[in-house]
């Protein structure tokens, strides 16, 4: 992959756009821009404009930034639900191997929860589903949390979201693995009071 090859795959209105493209490809990386160009080409635009490519990049970046914030809120919420339930008495907490290992050092349930990776937290949540019976649909919780974990991983690695593949999740009894469904999955894993604001912020990403 060569710098010039990426530049030559886009069309420019003027020399200023070309210089801007050179600047941002150097800052953000050739691979990232190539992914976006490939995505534009896959939608029947064989020679996308730099304006279109850079617009997609900014849209994707805003989407990733907002998803990151709200997905962190989901993680905090799940930790809080378990911590609030078992902080004073963890005798009924079904503990995973990783939780047991880390609790030996941190003692407190809440402090131990903070040390768990997302994957480890999800394992603990699924072992203690009944804590969330008034919040989530327990029948779809495992598949939806798995999809959540995969999306979180894509975002953490700063991947171009529109070109990625995702896991299936279930929204209103419909199952799909599209980015749109995975974003909706984040919404329904949030506490109720965050959902309207989340939808507003996601819709604003297009602006």
Model-derived regions, located:
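Extended intrinsically disordered or low-complexity regions, especially N/C-terminal cytosolic tails and loops
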Residues: 1-151, 162-207
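Acidic/aromatic/glycine-rich contiguous surface patches that form carbohydrate-binding/processing clefts
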Residues: 158
């Amino acid at each position: 992959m060569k710098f010039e090859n990426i530049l030559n795959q886009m069309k420019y209105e003027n020399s200023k756009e070309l210089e801007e493209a050179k600047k941002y490809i150097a800052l953000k990386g050739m691979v990232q821009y190539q992914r976006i160009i490939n995505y534009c080409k896959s939608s029947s635009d064989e020679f996308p404009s730099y304006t279109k490519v850079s617009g997609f990049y900014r849209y994707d970046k805003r989407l990733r930034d907002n998803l990151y914030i709200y997905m962190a809120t989901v993680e905090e919420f799940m930790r809080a639900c378990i911590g609030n339930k078992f902080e004073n008495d963890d005798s009924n907490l079904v503990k995973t191997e990783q939780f047991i290992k880390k609790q030996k050092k941190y003692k407190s349930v809440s402090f131990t929860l903070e040390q768990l990776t997302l994957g480890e937290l999800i394992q603990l949540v699924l072992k203690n589903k009944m804590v969330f019976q008034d919040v989530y649909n327990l029948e779809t919780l495992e598949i939806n949390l798995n999809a959540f974990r995969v999306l979180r991983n894509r975002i953490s690695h700063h991947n171009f979201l529109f070109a990625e593949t995702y896991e299936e999740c279930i929204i209103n009894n419909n199952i799909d693995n599209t980015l749109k469904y995975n974003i909706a999955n984040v919404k329904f894993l949030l506490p109720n009071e965050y959902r309207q604001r989340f939808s507003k912020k996601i819709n604003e990403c297009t602006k």
